[in-house]
Amino acid sequence: MGSDVRDMNLLPPVSSLSGNSSCNMPVSSSAQWAPVLDFPPGAPYSSLTPHSFIKQEPTWNPDPHEDQCLSAFTVHFSGQFTGTAGACRYGPFGAPTPSQATTGQARMFSNAPYLSNCLDNQQGMRNQGYSAVAFDGTPSYGHTPSHHTSQFTNHSFKHEDPLSQQTSLGEQQYSVPPPVYGCHTPTDTCTGSQALLLRTPYNSDNLYPMTSQLDCMTWNQMNLGSSLKSHGTSYENDSHSSPMLYNCGGQYRIHTHGVFRGIQDVRRVPGVTPAIVRSTEANEKRPFMCAYPGCNKRYFKLSHLQMHSRKHTGEKPYQCDFKDCERRFSRSDQLKRHQRRHTGIKPFQCKTCQRKFSRSDHLKTHTRTHTGKTSEKPFSCRWPSCQKKFARSDELVRHHNMHQRNMTKLQLAL
């Protein structure tokens, strides 16, 4: 399985912000560990451990954008946050009290539209080292996103290269999708036994996130889906809340290991294979589903899905080593069957007529001609008043052609 490894070092915070002076964000010189997200009220979370995990999986809800491709990968990050005070909070939880502004914990992801009373514009904020990267998206808690509409679609965010943070060469501008909606509360955070879930659909035209969501969930490898759903139920009936991500005066590091979906995606990034999507509990018998657009095939094993994904990517790693034969195959068993053409080996023999075959499915089809059982002739003629059955599909095709020729002759005679 291929991987996409990104190493993002955000710009260090500065001691002052442009804009409204009411935004008070003192920054300490010593690095401190702080929670990454805000979470819903009443969540029994303590502090987030320095080393935490974000497991990215596709949303369980129907994707309204059919042209987007799902991705599934794990993000491991460790963060050092230097901001000692909470940022200006606006939205469903209201503005912070003076005590919260001085004793609150550092927050993650500043964004000018969310903090319009604190910052004059997003560009000024970006130049000062804030909002170096932001993942934005629409809510997905089992309800339609009609309550949360996109308000800022023309902004952009950047990825700062640690080697050239002070130059324009380290800056890549990407289009920012609608605002992020996550779980937040001014005081509660996640514990080390829990995890943060990041769900991001990817568009096949580019490899950068179009929408994403950060959620808190109990870390349970056996049942991740139900934990997430139970966590988001408190928001299903809240039609007026519009939770926002908050400002963080900090520096952190993200390491991602993942896979992407889509033909265009895979061809643009060498060594990257399509995404692997775990299904919900309703499909536990075939838990591995292909996430390629328009393909919903499911498999018992992960290896089977990986082999299937090569049909979409066009990857053929197995090559015939016989002289003057350069044919390539996506699966090892296909190569093995092909090589029997060169060697002449036919390991499968009919016990009735002793005829040999190079493939087991060919032998199975052949044995139906001996038994004559209706149950072993699955191909039925659908021509009116014809009830013949055949053991092989090619026999049925020839039979249909016979009907067609007879009909043509009859029409010409009339």
Curated annotation (Swiss-Prot):
Tissue expression per record: Expressed around the pronephric anlage and in the pronephros; expression is restricted to the splanchnic mesoderm (the site where the glomus forms) from tailbud stages, and the glomus of early tadpoles. Not expressed in the pronephric tubules or pronephric duct. In tadpoles (stage 38-39), additional expression begins in the heart. Also expressed in the adult kidney (mesonephros).
Matches recorded under Pfam families: WT1 (PF02165), zf-C2H2 (PF00096)
Residue numbers marked as site, Important for interaction with target DNA: 389, 395
Sequence position, cross-link Glycyl lysine isopeptide (Lys-Gly) (interchain with G-Cter in SUMO): 55, 158
C2H2-type zinc finger locations on the chain: 288-312, 318-342, 348-370, 379-403
Function description: Transcription factor required for development of the vascular component of the pronephric kidney, the glomus; may repress tubule-specific gene expression in the portion of the pronephros fated to form the glomus. Recognizes and binds to the DNA sequence 5'-GCG(T/G)GGGCG-3'. Inhibits Wnt-signaling during embryonic development. Function may be isoform-specific: the isoform containing the KTS motif is less effective in inhibiting wnt signaling.
Name of the protein in its database record: Wilms tumor protein homolog A
Organism: Xenopus laevis (African clawed frog)
